[in-house]
Amino acid sequence: MRAARALLPLLLQACWTAAQDEPETPRAVAFQDCPVDLFFVLDTSESVALRLKPYGALVDKVKSFTKRFIDNLRDRYYRCDRNLVWNAGALHYSDEVEIIQGLTRMPGGRDALKSSVDAVKYFGKGTYTDCAIKKGLEQLLVGGSHLKENKYLIVVTDGHPLEGYKEPCGGLEDAVNEAKHLGVKVFSVAITPDHLEPRLSIIATDHTYRRNFTAADWGQSRDAEEAISQTIDTIVDMIKNNVEQVCCSFECQPARGPPGLRGDPGFEGERGKPGLPGEKGEAGDPGRPGDLGPVGYQGMKGEKGSRGEKGSRGPKGYKGEKGKRGIDGVDGVKGEMGYPGLPGCKGSPGFDGIQGPPGPKGDPGAFGLKGEKGEPGADGEAGRPGSSGPSGDEGQPGEPGPPGEKGEAGDEGNPGPDGAPGERGGPGERGPRGTPGTRGPRGDPGEAGPQGDQGREGPVGVPGDPGEAGPIGPKGYRGDEGPPGSEGARGAPGPAGPPGDPGLMGERGEDGPAGNGTEGFPGFPGYPGNRGAPGINGTKGYPGLKGDEGEAGDPGDDNNDIAPRGVKGAKGYRGPEGPQGPPGHQGPPGPDECEILDIIMKMCSCCECKCGPIDLLFVLDSSESIGLQNFEIAKDFVVKVIDRLSRDELVKFEPGQSYAGVVQYSHSQMQEHVSLRSPSIRNVQELKEAIKSLQWMAGGTFTGEALQYTRDQLLPPSPNNRIALVITDGRSDTQRDTTPLNVLCSPGIQVVSVGIKDVFDFIPGSDQLNVISCQGLAPSQGRPGLSLVKENYAELLEDAFLKNVTAQICIDKKCPDYTCPITFSSPADITILLDGSASVGSHNFDTTKRFAKRLAERFLTAGRTDPAHDVRVAVVQYSGTGQQRPERASLQFLQNYTALASAVDAMDFINDATDVNDALGYVTRFYREASSGAAKKRLLLFSDGNSQGATPAAIEKAVQEAQRAGIEIFVVVVGRQVNEPHIRVLVTGKTAEYDVAYGESHLFRVPSYQALLRGVFHQTVSRKVALG
């Protein structure tokens, strides 16, 4: 025994030493542990990855949220002697799902899980949330604990897209319903802003698992950080509370301790809530029949009756009142004057005019024959009434009338005297229980008893209060008609009726005794007597004078009978030949060559400018950030552009002519195209149907790779004009797509980029759009294109934008040349002399300057038979005496159109008097000093013939002085208020005679200043000035 006691300390020391030598192992999950399986599902699709620059910044915030959440997964001890422990894992997804790390025990695997999350590279493609949720469920069920009540998913997403493509794993609702069926709770956490709340609400198990949870926000504000921290704390607390109810239920608690001492009696409880409604009672006795119901509703409209007979024509209506004066409309913009049309054919003979008014009254005719005897005259009118006859005797009294109706009931009588007092009644029944009294004051607290054990799970609570009344339901249908009621009680007597009609007149009574009254007044005249016999006819009177002419009678009936055609007369003899008439005036010359070419251009349809043949390619961004609705609008835009080119620009999309194709793209190796070269497409109609059938891809954005695909597949070498129209949001994933965006740029291709805001309302990236459209490249590297930016996709379908796009596509039209070219065969110095007087006006002077610039451009760009022949132009403004601009010192002939146009634009309107003679002398001196002898000298003068103090003789002298200097004068006249004699002298230099042929080639007339800029007038003037 003593030996055993001595050996015991040695054995204990050996065991302790052996235990210290064993390697340390991770703590195993004890029986009393309560494990929780938590799995993160992270969205790294395009709508998240490419929303912020630099691309992937929002994904980094999602990863930061996940790592912060993992740091908050700490064990907890419950009072039921159980420990909450965590198992966590994560995956990320786009249109594919990748497991970051499976379920790992915390805290031992915390660092490894955080490192794996930090190493995630975003996919940046489509969004298959249903597949990701089902993959997360698989990880929870296969690798998790045995408690299915403690399994949670945290889905971090922006909810995009809302619609547009079929999710391949059964859809989002199917995945969420599967999670509910398996008992897995799903939290939905938003990536704000621009998240789709409806989709997030579908993902969450119920509204308590959604709330306003946020994983990442754009701003770095304090509020945003607090919202993210609050999201993590709220989710962790909800899980801990739920787990406590699961792991600390009554079945899982350890053995209970001994019962405690009986406590003091509690205070009287408050009055309980009303009990539940009792069972429905038996049906009561039937009530008495109701009163007669109200009049029923109007019945349904009957069928349409047969058509009635035609009514008689109504009377002619009165003339209506004069209407009120309407509101003055807005003045419309005056349109441009149209080109004069060709003379029309001779019209058909007109209809007969309206019959003229009746002529004046004719002279009275001769007396007619004696008339026949007239008929007897009409009866005469009644005579005056005769005197009144004597009054009649008094009649006998009449018989009594029938008895009257029963009178109304009388008023109630006064109350009678009080009766004798009755006997004392017996005791009444017991009354209802009174209301309880007010609660007494609270007593002093007793001594605190020992702390009791945790109570059991309480019973099921009483039902809650009934909810608020629902909304009023729709009006019910009309019920069946009730049975007729019983006959009512007799009503009170009605009011007295009106007095009856007077009775019949009684028979005449006997004559009474003679009266003794005074004689009455004479009676009224009696009624007229009968008509007397006709008297003897008088002697016949003399005939009266003829009456005035009566009014014209109504026109007789039309005579529709065709009169027989008369016999054709014999042909007459030919008359003698008349003398020869004098020669007519010389007619105006016919239209010149420029006007003839203009008429041909207007009349001939084959003269229209033709667009094409062209090779037209559309490249459509079909990524997730575009959205389904915007992609559908882009397809409609393509179809409308093709229709407009076919209809308005007469482009023929058929083999051997023009070609069209469409490419839609998303991420890497995800491109699709349809074109007229496809084997299944035979014509442009089938091409449009194929475009409408394209399905939205909803993936990432690899624009460079798509443009390379377009160049390789759809842009072979071709002699046609090649145009590529790229529609995108300008946010290509250039970090992973290394293909340059200017891959389409080449001298033979024109690229137009259209940037439009995406579903997140982000402004398109102008830097990428400029690169796509070949901006800033040398001509040898590529043809500069065009970059356009729009607010939204709906603007693509606006009429103005469609016109601009078709105009840009057909910018290189092939048009016939009807410009009426001019050629100079010798050197020429031309001066354009503008009228700057007050009668012209500032606005008209600006129009004249624009016309002068057109003429100058035609002169300076005209062809020359010899390149050594110089054509020089000067523009001068004149007004009163000594008022010519520019001054002589600065006036010179110019050959550079840009310099000349700048000088014309800088001219200020003088706005003073008019002195044509002084202006002619100024120009004549200028030609003598600045013009060479070999050059043709031409002067184009603007004038209305009115000049200050000028006479025909003075004008003739100034013009002849210019002609002696070799100057040929051409005159432009605007308007109708002109001095015609002075104009003729300015053109010919002669006051005696006027050469019409010479005048027609040197005088130009227009009705207004606006007409200077219409049509080909500037071509006509410049051609005649050049030919001389």
UniProtKB/Swiss-Prot annotation:
CDD domains: vWA_collagen_alpha_1-VI-type. Coiled coil: none annotated. Keywords: Cell adhesion, Collagen, Congenital muscular dystrophy, Disease variant, Extracellular matrix, Glycoprotein, Hydroxylation, Repeat, Secreted, Signal. It is found in: Secreted, Extracellular space, Extracellular matrix. GO terms for cellular component: basement membrane; collagen type VI trimer; collagen-containing extracellular matrix; endoplasmic reticulum lumen; extracellular exosome; extracellular region; intracellular vesicle; lysosomal membrane. Residues 268-285, 301-334 have a biased composition (Basic and acidic residues). Residues 593-1028 are annotated as: C-terminal globular domain. Residues 1-19 form the signal peptide. Residues 384-394, 457-471, 483-493 have a biased composition (Low complexity). A motif (Cell attachment site) lies at residues 262-264, 442-444, 478-480. One of its GO terms (molecular function) is collagen binding. Residues 254-590 are annotated as: Disordered. Gene3D superfamilies: von Willebrand factor, type A domain. Glycans are attached at residues 212, 516, 537, 804, 896. GO terms for biological process: 2-oxoglutarate metabolic process; adipose tissue development; apoptotic nuclear changes; autophagy; basement membrane organization; bone development; bone mineralization; canonical Wnt signaling pathway. Residues 20-256 are annotated as: N-terminal globular domain. Collagen VI acts as a cell-binding protein. Belongs to the type VI collagen family. It is linked to Bethlem myopathy 1A: A form of Bethlem myopathy, a slowly progressive muscular dystrophy characterized by joint contractures, most frequently affecting the elbows and ankles, and muscle weakness and wasting involving the proximal and extensor muscles more than the distal and flexor ones. The clinical onset more often occurs in childhood or adulthood, but it can be prenatal with decreased fetal movements or neonatal with hypotonia. The hallmark of Bethlem myopathy is long finger flexion contractures. Inheritance can be autosomal dominant or autosomal recessive. Trimers composed of three different chains: alpha-1(VI), alpha-2(VI), and alpha-3(VI) or alpha-5(VI) or alpha-6(VI). This is Collagen alpha-1(VI) chain. It comes from Homo sapiens. The lineage of its organism: Eukaryota, Metazoa, Chordata, Craniata, Vertebrata.
